[in-house]
């Protein structure tokens, strides 16, 4: 709906028929990128859906102390998710190698600036907020959180369209992939395609996290053959089951 209103408004401003303006919406053009930025919803906050972070710190991260863990945040918006992951890994003595991508260039620009207001914080995940400063991920100044730019030595930020039907080429394999709060934009066919592509970029035994509201709607026919839906208590995720069993599998 937002996208349609944007197209109608811009067609009127340019005095073009609706169909003619639509012809201008070609990928990799300014018009198309502006449409994407207008149509995407970017509500996010630090340590959103805290159960995922609790699971990581109780079940996975203790086994990775002193080791590198590769994580892809595939719909990172303005950066709260990958920053949360970075801080948690640092807190547990894990070497973070994080790739963060999103389709919205405006949100990625906000991420790179690294200035966050109170709206990036929620009661959900509140107990983790203190580690943002404890790990020197950033500092709280004048009711804002200011990101330490050194974080970008460990977080690579890229613009990437999950619906583009191609594999991300900016990393090899990830141990953990976060694809949360993005499947609401996709139909089942696209969800299946995205999960298949993500599975190809996942190391054996690796995990994919969807949002709590999304993973319950993922039927077995959408899950790649190389993956299975697994739960640890009330926390559900997808696990890559082929290949040599990794530390991730052995700890669950």
Name the predicted role of every residue range.
Residues 1-70:
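Conserved AdoMet
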Residues 57, 61, 86-90, 199:
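A structural alpha-helix within SAM-dependent methyltransferase catalytic domains
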Residues 67-78, 99:
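Conserved class I S-adenosyl-L-methionine
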Residues 78-92:
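Conserved SAM-binding loop of SAM-dependent methyltransferases across substrates and taxa
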Residues 97-178, 182-186, 190, 216, ...:
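Extended basic-aromatic, gly/pro-enriched interface segments that bind polyanionic ligands
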Residues 176, 225-252:
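Core SAM-dependent methyltransferase catalytic element
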Residues 192-204:
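A short glycine-rich, Lys/Arg-flanked "PGG" loop and its adjoining helix->strand segment in the class I
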Residues 204-212:
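Conserved beta-strand signature within the Rossmann-like core of class I S-adenosyl-L-methionine
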């Amino acid at each position: 709906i937002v996208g349609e209103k944007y197209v109608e408004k811009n067609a009127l401003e340019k005095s073009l028929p609706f169909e003619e303006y639509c012809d201008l919406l070609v990928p990799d053009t300014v018009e198309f990128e502006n449409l994407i930025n207008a149509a995407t919803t970017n509500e996010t906050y630090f340590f959103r859906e805290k159960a995922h972070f609790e699971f990581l710190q109780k079940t996975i991260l203790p086994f990775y102390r002193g080791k590198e863990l590769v994580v892809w945040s595939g719909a990172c918006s303005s950066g709260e998710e990958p920053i949360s992951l970075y801080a948690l890994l640092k807190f547990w003595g894990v070497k973070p190698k994080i790739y963060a991508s999103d389709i919205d260039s405006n949100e990625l620009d906000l991420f790179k600036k690294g200035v966050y207001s109170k709206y990036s914080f929620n009661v959900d995940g509140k107990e983790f907020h203190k580690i943002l400063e404890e790990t020197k991920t950033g500092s709280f100044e004048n009711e804002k959180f200011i990101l330490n730019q050194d974080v970008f030595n460990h977080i690579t930020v890229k613009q990437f369209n999950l619906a583009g039907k191609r594999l991300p080429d900016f990393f090899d394999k990830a141990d953990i992939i976060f694809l949360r709060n993005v499947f609401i934009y996709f139909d089942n066919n696209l969800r299946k395609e995205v999960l298949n592509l993500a599975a190809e970029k996942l190391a054996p035994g690796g995990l994919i996290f969807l949002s709590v509201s999304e993973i319950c709607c993922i039927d077995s026919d959408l899950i790649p053959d190389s993956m299975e839906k697994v739960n640890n208590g009330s926390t559900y995720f997808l696990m890559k089951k082929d290949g040599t069993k990794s530390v991730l599998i052995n700890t669950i």
